[in-house]
Each structure stands twice: as structure tokens, then as C-alpha cells.
């Protein structure tokens, strides 16, 4: 469930949502910025403490999400490339971002 104290609406109508997913053993905290059209503006990995898989923080990998909406698949190995050495982290973050976008579409888009 999303926590209200981790969801912000900006003055220009964009949203910032902070969420967590399980990596391999530890939680990954990330933020999704969504513009007023429902498009992802950016993804930021805020906390990653796993021993391996730090490639998840790679800017080039995160750029794949920019422009995606809730109507896009946002699925690993479909429209999002996987990361060798960070497979579980990449899958869980990708699935989490898809969940954030579904939440935005259902609960925030009309606000």
C-alpha cells in the first residue's frame, strides 16, 4: 500500500511518489516523477544496500522509463532491458514502477 506521506503533488501538476520493493535480500527505495500528462519524468534510486546489483542505479538504465505511461507494458525484457548481475533488482523495481503507474492512473490522475 502507498503511504500518503510519500506522495507529493507539485505546483505544476506533476507528482512524486516514493515506493519500496524487495531486491534480492534488502529493500530498494525509489522515487517516480510523473508529469501532468501521466508520463514518467524520471526514476531515482534513493536507497540501495544490496551487496551486488548496484547497476540498478545506472542513469542509462533508468532513462528507459522516461515517457512511459500506465498504458505502456513497463515489463522487463519487453520494453525495459534487463541488467546482467542485477536481475532480481531490475525485475522488482520495474514491477514496482508499473504498480506506481497503475496507482497514479486510478487514484491521482483526476486530482
What kind of feature is each model-predicted range?
Residues 1-91, 95-111:
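Flexible, solvent-exposed loop/hinge segments and secondary-structure transition points
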Amino acid at each position: 500500500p502507498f503511504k500518503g506521506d510519500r506522495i507529493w503533488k507539485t505546483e505544476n501538476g506533476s507528482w512524486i511518489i516514493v515506493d519500496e520493493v524487495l531486491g534480492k535480500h534488502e529493500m530498494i527505495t525509489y522515487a517516480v516523477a510523473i508529469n501532468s500528462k501521466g508520463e514518467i519524468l524520471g526514476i531515482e534510486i534513493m536507497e540501495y544496500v544490496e551487496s551486488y546489483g548496484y547497476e540498478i542505479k545506472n542513469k542509462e538504465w533508468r532513462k528507459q522509463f522516461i515517457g512511459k505511461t500506465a498504458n505502456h507494458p513497463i515489463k522487463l525484457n519487453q520494453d525495459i532491458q534487463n541488467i546482467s548481475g542485477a536481475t532480481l533488482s531490475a525485475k522488482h523495481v520495474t514491477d514496482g514502477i508499473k504498480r506506481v503507474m497503475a496507482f497514479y492512473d486510478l487514484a491521482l490522475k483526476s486530482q
